Amino acid sequence: MSTYTRPVMLLLCGLLLLTLAIAVLNTLVPLWLAQANLPTWQVGMVSSSYFTGNLVGTLFTGYLIKRIGFNRSYYLASLIFAAGCVGLGVMVGFWSWMSWRFIAGIGCAMIWVVVESALMCSGTSHNRGRLLAAYMMVYYMGTFLGQLLVSKVSGELLHVLPWVTGMILAGILPLLFTRIVNQQTQARHSSSISAMLKLRQARLGVNGCIISGIVLGSLYGLMPLYLKHQGMANASIGFWMAVLVSAGILGQWPMGRLADKFGRLLVLRVQVFVVILGSIAMLTQAAMAPALFILGAAGFTLYPVAMAWACEKVEHHQLVAMNQALLLSYTVGSLLGPSFAAMLMQNYSDNLLFIMIASVSFIYLLMLLRNAGQTPNPVAHI
């Protein structure tokens, strides 16, 4: 049976369009607020409302999938995201936009839970790494192309909202031509997020998603600031960020394939070790290009491998709940990491960004090394 079936390919096509819209809005919303002369703290609050929406959306999507299935949950998530986009054109204001970005955040989180859960339920322990790698490749490619779109088209609010909304609605179309079966509805017992978080045999996967959130959130949010403080121009900052993201895209498929072939525990150990090496290399500033490349290739691929590790430890009907737990863990890490790193950078030194990344990665590496010989056979193999 092919790894990339017709439903999987159509699902990824829809995700690409939705990710383009997400990237465009995430880039332009802060700029629109600044043009409206809102103070910086209000711009930050609007951004926080989006991430709060992500948390809320993550919590209830599993129940929704169980009730109405993958397809309808996907349609509903896309429509909620589209509503959050259209609402931005009603009125530019702090409370209005905070509400609409909260709604958009819910829709986006629902999309991620639906897509990730559908891919995991479609795969097996032998190909789930490649499926999640393809998901991350599409996600990062959509993010990259979204940045290109922002630089090529008019950034005016009322010019952008119509075609972005159209792109969101177009993202629904691929799934109208296929049906993703939700085998979880056949299970007698449903699983909760809290139960998945407490599952001992999957704890390394959960911790890996938290670490991944800390690493990626810090790199995405604070690397441009670090480079700016090194005296680089905006064009140079854009180039080095492109190197970082491109490395993440290029690393997805090989890492997924290696994880499926040689085991996720071994690949996770190598990835975390490489993240530590890349962080140390960034501190020396001896060779920024290779240092950033290996940091991106290893750091950006942690999440799908950690997910695949956790998902092979649960029964098939528990996959949706496990995915919610993993996405929630990643979100928490991506909120905590940049906040703590920014505080260290402001009060002490910019180099503490990479010291923090290396430190949390080292702690996770110790957890992975302690797990030697404790690798029970996967149960989610059907």
Swiss-Prot record:
Q: Kindly list the places in or outside the cell where this protein is found, as annotated in its UniProt entry.
A: Cell inner membrane
Stretches of the chain found on the membrane's Cytoplasmic side: 1-7, 66-74, 123-130, 178-203, 252-269, 312-324, 370-382
Q: Which InterPro entries match?
A: MFS, MFS_dom, MFS_trans_sf, MFS_YcaD, MFS_YcaD-like
The highest taxon in the source lineage is Bacteria
Mark the transmembrane ranges: 8-28, 45-65, 75-95, 102-122, 131-151, 157-177, 204-224, 231-251, 270-290, 291-311, 325-345, 349-369
One Pfam family here: MFS_1
Q: Which UniProt keywords apply?
A: Cell inner membrane, Cell membrane, Membrane, Transmembrane, Transmembrane helix, Transport
Q: How does it sit in the membrane?
A: Multi-pass membrane protein
Entries under Gene3D superfamilies matching the protein: MFS general substrate transporter like domains
Q: Which GO terms describe its molecular function?
A: transmembrane transporter activity
Record topology, Periplasmic segments: 29-44, 96-101, 152-156, 225-230, 346-348
Which GO terms of the cellular component aspect does the record hold?
plasma membrane
Q: Is the Membrane keyword given for this protein?
A: yes
Q: What HAMAP family does the record tag this protein with?
A: MFS_YcaD (MF_01149)
Database matches in NCBIfam families:
PRK03633.1 (NF002962)
Q: Which family is this protein grouped under?
A: Belongs to the major facilitator superfamily. YcaD (TC 2.A.1.26) family.
Spell out the protein name for this chain.
Uncharacterized MFS-type transporter YcaD
UniProt organism field: Salmonella typhimurium (strain LT2 / SGSC1412 / ATCC 700720)
Q: Which gene encodes it?
A: ycaD
